């Protein structure tokens, strides 16, 4: 907060458990309303969680923004050991408020129609990847390589795309090999137009 970026108050209006996530519906006219600057896909906010007499900063993607109703969805991933944001999300109730700042998090270059897209990430970045695919032209073939278990909820874009889940226990080398195999199988080369990692 020392950098004095504009601060907004998000009001939690809905809470839903989608293990391993908690889905929060938030309302904020000053950030998400029809008269505010349009946030690009994958935009993320710095959330300030009050806990143990301190404020802890965590960044979360604002997805499915509805400017008419000034709402968005935030997915908080739970893992062990749990951190301040995870503990807060597990007990938060509708009506609670939390401070956020937009300081960075809005750089985004959209793909052009027909661009071949590759997106690589894990469960923490899954909301941003889903947001990027959903906002892309339907003529752009998209492949998502996700470091995530085969079972369990994973946020996905509604539009047609290819999803490859890779066991989180594998090494980075095996993950990269899986990406290479996928591209060679699809195209016979490694040419890509747009990459999001």
Locations of regions flagged by a protein language model:
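Ferredoxin-reductase
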Residues: 3, 9-90
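Intrinsic-disorder/low-complexity coil detector
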Residues: 5, 19, 28, 39-40, ...
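FNR/FR-type flavoprotein reductase catalytic core
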Residues: 84-197
